[in-house]
Amino acid sequence: LISSDPANMNYLTGYDAWSFYYAQCVLVHINEDEPICFLRDQDAGGAYIKTYLQDKNIIKYPEKYIHTPPSHPYEYLVEVIKQKKWDNIRIGVEMDSHYFTATCFEKLLTGLNRASFHDSERLVNWIRIVKSDSEIKLMQAAARISEKAMKTAFDVINPGVRQCDAVADIQKSLFNGTPEFGGDYASIATLLPTGKGTSASHLTATEDKFVKGEATIIEISGVHKRYHCPMARTVLLGKKNQKKIDTMKATNEALDSGISAVKPGNTANDVAQKFWGVLDKYGIKKESRTGYSIGIGYPPDWGEQTLNISKGDKTILQPNVT
């Protein structure tokens, strides 16, 4: 298996650094005692510090491969695989990983023409969906940070305040964390669509000021040791709008109904049916999913890209699924 998703690399080895913008991966072979971390030379020190791997399982490629096309780090990876005599076997790759580029795959196909490549279908992501008790504690720490930062958001988002100033305070709260748990950078920027922007879920802050009577969506995540626990809330500034208030009440009722179905043995679809059953009762339409699996995250996403709380998702909920 060649795993290029930085969250999977972290899960498999403990590796944690802002180096995912260029080629890196973890190799997993059934006959090897440990995974192998493949990184650029400049970042290998991070693997010595952050991972549990023996030095021999940290392989670094020379800096001459950085942004010097047609040369590419995966050419070096091909030679590593050949040296280990793994060039005539089935190899799984993460075809839809954000950081597994077309060039990465092309170099593998060209350099390892005796191997057969197969989509791993998010194998590691699906393993990550069920957390250990220790991971749950990290998720709970992230949740406490989210709660604190959301309270900060409620305090600082007011008519006349610039959006960017509010985000500065929110970010400070997220990084400060709590006395027990320090914060970390999130995989997604603070999302703050306001006014007409609430029709587009993923807008970030501008220098514009908040306006009395408008709604603002706040989507943030506390992060502790790369584990995320996102939270989203909507606030109305000043002047009441009964339609928005009624919609919020119905949405909260739908959330409570969905949460009541979050039990081991139920499916994600069971939760979704309870949620949308309430929305349907009030004539409210929502086309997008209402939840997804979370855990370790790196930009550009804190979702695990597996379970969705949406109609038709038959994933069975288990203890410690987050």
Predicted regions and their residues:
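Active-site neighborhoods and metal-handling regions in enzymes and metal-associated proteins
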Residues: 1-322
